[in-house]
Amino acid sequence: MKKKRYYVNQLALYKHDMQNTWKVLKQAMNISKNKSEITEIQFNDTIVDDVGNMANIFNKYFASIGKNLAEVIPPSTKHFSEYLGTQNPSSIFLAPTYREEILDIVSNLNNKKSPGHDDINNFILKGVISSIIDPLVHIFNLSLSSGQVPAGMKIAKVIPLFKNGDKLSVNNYRPISLLSTLSKVLEKIIYIRTIKFLKLHNIFSNFQFGFREKHSTIHALLNFIDKVAHAIDKFSHLVGIFLDFSKAFDTIDHEILLYKLSHYGVRGKALEWFRSYLSNRQQYVFLNGHASSMQDIKFGVPQGSLLGPLLFIIYINDFCRSSDVLSFILFADDSNLFFSHNNPYTLVSTINAELDKVTQWIRANKLSLNLQKTKYMVFSNSLNTLPINIVFDNTPLENVSHTKFLGLIVDNKLSWKYHIDKICKTISRNIGIINKLKFHFPPSTLLTLYSSLILPYLNYGILAWGNTQQTSLNRLLLLQKKSLRIIYNSAICSHADPLFIDSKLLKIGDLYQFNLGQFMYNYNRETLPHVFNDMFPKNQSIHSYPTRRSNELHLPLCRTVFAQNTFIYNGPKLWNSLNDDIKASPSLNTFKNKLKSFLLNSYSNAQNN
């Protein structure tokens, strides 16, 4: 009984944490971690099993990735600085840190993160912070004022993590970098000041959705849907090119990055600080309890760092300037290009000409593409096969019918068939887990598992795919009903609406409406990324004369059913249908509670009728 209560409490604690939920479930189901040590690898056609030699081989391989890629990049006809535009005349000032700021940063550190080479974990730091806060304030302020980063904060402890394929090949492992806890605190201090400055001066491209506050993969996906819908509604053909950069974070050129930082206003001591931060970095591999020798890191942004992602999006911020014709959607290194035209021959010739320009930007910035993994897709109403052949850097690209894009499987008809197949497969497996545990846990705990093992797959990207064909959505609804009947131990043929009401869970169709309502609430509160500004004007701004519905959002004219099924049309339609009490909610949480109650009430009303 005590053990059962422990698992119930743990699952409740990790309700919204998928990784830790799985850990608890594996404990409860007596599933071993099966985390075997690396016992041998292949190097120069020889099997190596000495742990010290293996650690050194791994370290040399990881440290050489950026250098090896940089050496084979052809020269560009352009200089990287030609793409940067007007220089920011303002310069950043690194204001000193203070006790309260450091205490706040430390208190928000995740206790479960592994320590770096100094073996000081976040839990220990939190325990002693009050005793060392004054020396830390002094050290960090000395770093800011001198433009120097302590050498001990520039060492990474690297753990090789197997991905897939042949376990003997070092190519099939990725490095997990663990940094000093104190370096993370210093990075956070710098991050706060840098991001505030860059936002103040509107440095970032509107088409960069990665690693930015109030920007997410969902916003990038909706921007993509918007482009496809507008093209198809105009009876044009749209080509999407899904780029695959080779080890982009590892190949960043430090001198180019520092030049761009200066261009955007990071100068003086601040620029010296970043130069110190990037230079003389070292790493070692820790394998099976043994440490390798040190290797210098001369390329890339520090993996596992807070500043790394920020520095990366600064580095590629001007990528959109490589073409004035193509549209861009960027999510860190997940970059995608789009162009539409009603004439397929003009479409192809324009894209291929513009891709030559994009190639020059990539070369000038010393990045490289994996052209075997870079694909393109044609979105069109045409039933005929279009004569479209796309060439990138003298290499013909593969035309695919579907591909993975920001966590969704996108197909060229946007039917979402492949993605829903994947969701159904994952949810079915997880329902099996809930079924195994139904006699060991009460319904309340099983509902927690539903929130961890089923709901995230239904919620993710639903604004993109959630209004697809009803036959596809019915497959998901049946799985929802099946899971609730298992949780409540109800008969297979029992009516499911009371179960949705009791659990306060929404059916898949209403889950789409719930997410769409939140998007529209944020639109009306002007908290969405800039690309959505003025997307849904009010009727009063369309008509020159007053109408009964002047304050409602204007419903766009959609020529195709495809466009009418997207958020472009359904967003304003839903918002106009909501009562004023829901729309006037003072906060997003209040709005969510009211909208959810409204949607759940429809189940009760359906029962009563």
Language-model regions, residue ranges each:
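Basic/polar low-complexity segments
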Residues: 1-97, 522-556
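Short, conserved catalytic/metal-binding micro-motifs enriched in Asp/Glu and His
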Residues: 40, 62, 66, 106, ...
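Short linear motifs embedded in intrinsically disordered, charge-biased segments
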Residues: 43-48, 471, 477-609
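Conserved pre-catalytic core of RNA-dependent polymerases
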Residues: 62, 92-302
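Short, conserved micro-motifs composed of acidic
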Residues: 92, 353, 368-401
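Active-site palm subdomain of RNA-directed nucleic acid polymerases
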Residues: 190-208, 238, 309-339
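Catalytic palm subdomain of template-directed nucleic-acid polymerases
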Residues: 247-264, 336-359
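Basic, alpha-helical interaction scaffolds
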Residues: 398-463
